[in-house]
């Protein structure tokens, strides 16, 4: 299974690339994490937030592989424990489908995209910076994988 981690925004600091790469490389071929960076909509004086989000939603949907489960990160999404998330990962692995895990731009995701999602994942009630989210998601996927494999990385 491939997890296509589709994010709006580019040019992350070096520490983000290093942290993300560290956790992504720890995952086995049976559960690969592939980063897909998309440019933000160009902000201008005449545009609106709704227009920017709609433009980004089109880019996101064009990057989602055919047949992939659509999962969005959303501040109002379901928050899970590590063990609960590992069960979610196990379900994804068992389905045989790829997963498209979506992070929107600075203005969030278009509501039409959120409505299309099979699941809405909330990392925290806190507002988190996009660079940190990239590393956290990669780490949580690796942690969930380690729980499924009874690897000592995660401790209860």
Swiss-Prot record:
<keyword id="KW-0698">rRNA processing</keyword>
<keyword id="KW-0963">Cytoplasm</keyword>
<feature type="binding site">
    <location>
        <position position="104"/>
    </location>
    <ligand>
        <name>S-adenosyl-L-methionine</name>
    </ligand>
</feature>
<comment type="function">
    <text>Specifically methylates the pseudouridine at position 1915 (m3Psi1915) in 23S rRNA.</text>
</comment>
<keyword id="KW-0489">Methyltransferase</keyword>
<dbReference type="GO" id="GO:0070038">
    <property type="term" value="F:rRNA (pseudouridine-N3-)-methyltransferase activity"/>
</dbReference>
<feature type="binding site">
    <location>
        <position position="73"/>
    </location>
    <ligand>
        <name>S-adenosyl-L-methionine</name>
    </ligand>
</feature>
<comment type="similarity">
    <text>Belongs to the RNA methyltransferase RlmH family.</text>
</comment>
<keyword id="KW-0949">S-adenosyl-L-methionine</keyword>
<dbReference type="InterPro" id="IPR029028">
    <property type="entry name" value="Alpha/beta_knot_MTases"/>
</dbReference>
<dbReference type="GO" id="GO:0005737">
    <property type="term" value="C:cytoplasm"/>
</dbReference>
<keyword id="KW-0808">Transferase</keyword>
<dbReference type="InterPro" id="IPR029026">
    <property type="entry name" value="tRNA_m1G_MTases_N"/>
</dbReference>
<dbReference type="InterPro" id="IPR003742">
    <property type="entry name" value="RlmH-like"/>
</dbReference>
<comment type="subunit">
    <text>Homodimer.</text>
</comment>
<feature type="binding site">
    <location>
        <begin position="123"/>
        <end position="128"/>
    </location>
    <ligand>
        <name>S-adenosyl-L-methionine</name>
    </ligand>
</feature>
<protein>
    <recommendedName>
        <fullName>Ribosomal RNA large subunit methyltransferase H</fullName>
        <ecNumber>2.1.1.177</ecNumber>
    </recommendedName>
</protein>
<dbReference type="Pfam" id="PF02590">
    <property type="entry name" value="SPOUT_MTase"/>
</dbReference>
